[in-house]
Amino acid sequence: MFLGTHSPRLDDKGRLILPAKFRDELEGGVVMTRGQDRCIYVFTTREFEELHDRMRQAPLASKQARDYMRVFLSGANAETPDKQHRITIPQALRTYAGLDRELAVIGAGSRVEIWDAGTWDEYLTANESAFADTAEEVIPGLF
């Protein structure tokens, strides 16, 4: 499970060093793709394959399902971390997420999310006040 917030920097070649706490789980390979809220989702290869299997259950007759899968899967990129535990984020994904050098890499349970640090700070500021108020509504019986 991925937890916590980390602050690596993007180098000139579009690479970031994976946080130490995430390395063991991600060393076998990752799949990066567009996430909601202009971030990048990073899945283990296994988790992405399971997610894709669930997506394949959606009816092809559904335009919404087709549209979602096209956007989600067309942005996907498989990558294996190098010996220095770095992954290269493709330019298209860096542009999508508006990444600058300063990043926020967060653990989101079954996935990692890569955010531009400024965008992450804005997101937290906008959403922290509603955090306590929405817990019961979003996940009934959680607390």
Curated annotation (Swiss-Prot):
SUPFAM superfamilies: AbrB/MazE/MraZ-like (SSF89447). One of its GO terms (cellular component) is nucleoid. InterPro entries: MraZ, MraZ_C, MraZ_dom, MraZ_N, MraZ_sf, SpoVT-AbrB_dom, SpoVT-AbrB_sf. GO terms for biological process: negative regulation of DNA-templated transcription initiation. The keyword Repeat applies. Keywords: Cytoplasm, DNA-binding, Repeat, Transcription, Transcription regulation. GO terms for molecular function: DNA-binding transcription factor activity; transcription cis-regulatory region binding. Belongs to the MraZ family. Its main location: cytoplasm. It is found in: Cytoplasm, Nucleoid. The keyword Transcription applies. PANTHER family: TRANSCRIPTIONAL REGULATOR MRAZ. Gene3D superfamilies: Transcriptional regulator MraZ domain. Residues 5-47, 76-119 form the SpoVT-AbrB domain. It comes from Clavibacter michiganensis subsp. michiganensis (strain NCPPB 382). This is Transcriptional regulator MraZ. Forms oligomers.
